Amino acid sequence: MRMALAVLLNSLLILCVPTPLLAKGKTVKVTIKGAVLKTPIEISDPKILANFQVWTGPGTSTADRQSLMIDWSQGPVRKPPESLSRYRVSFHTDPNDQIVYVVCYAFSPGSVPGYVYVPGEVDEWHGLNVRSVARGVEVEGKWFRAWSAWERVARPLIEKAEVADSIQPR
């Protein structure tokens, strides 16, 4: 009887858990969109993407000090100046190249560190994000320093795209 009850409860739990929580695929693509970009930037090189996995950091079973695209070790920081350019960064995973996590990346050209905002309860992408990883109130709705590995990849791509877009005939 106990065994049957345990099997039934486990079956119900599996049926009730959202698919993204069960299908923790690797990041297969990251897209960067922004008002100043004509077309989204896509990063799909598996060697690059190996560093930027959704299911690492707070709210997961790994306590990596740098993961996703955030330097978690520095903790939350003040909201950055509104003058910084902002970009929506979407993480896509298998199966079916689906978007499973979205954050905001803000930076200004130069050596000033960039920032990452993890959407909170009142933000558009919060629902999607918590179906993948519920990072908790210590993280959601807060700004963090961008991880230097992310900055080395994203900044040159964004700056190159912005320059290319600015010289295109309108």
Feature locations, PLM:
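Function-determining sites in protein domains
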Residues: 22-170
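Membrane-interface motif at the C-terminal end of an N-terminal transmembrane signal
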Residues: 17-21
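Bacterial N-terminal signal peptides
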Residues: 6-16
